[in-house]
Regions:
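Metal- and O2-centered redox machinery and metal/ROS homeostasis
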Residues: 1-96
Length: 96
């Protein structure tokens, strides 16, 4: 599978890792990335800074939850289940 990182290749499967993988999936497509920025009002700088903030990472997953097709596609692309992403969001929210 080349250089693509998948959740099933991560030993920990930790919430931050899953959120970052999902964010990477979101940003890997120009249309999806543009939609994320337009709907959230975030800038590219906001995204970079948010990548270290558990609350913001949780919001990226919540954003995916708002459109089930994207949640399922992201989970599939990163080798996780939609439930794992939702659980990661819950864990990240606990950290805030």
């Amino acid at each position: 599978m080349g250089d693509t990182i998948r959740a099933d290749e991560e030993e920990s499967g930790d919430a931050v890792t899953l959120a970052l993988l999902a964010l990477g999936w979101l940003l890997s497509d120009g249309d999806r990335a543009s939609r994320l920025l337009a709907l959230t009002g975030m800038t590219a700088d906001d995204l970079r800074q948010g990548a270290t903030n558990p609350r913001i990472l949780a919001e990226f997953i919540r954003y995916l939850e708002g459109y089930e097709a994207d949640l399922v596609a992201a989970a599939d692309a990163i080798g996780a289940s939609p439930a794992q992403l939702v659980n990661a969001r819950i864990e990240l929210e606990r950290r805030t």
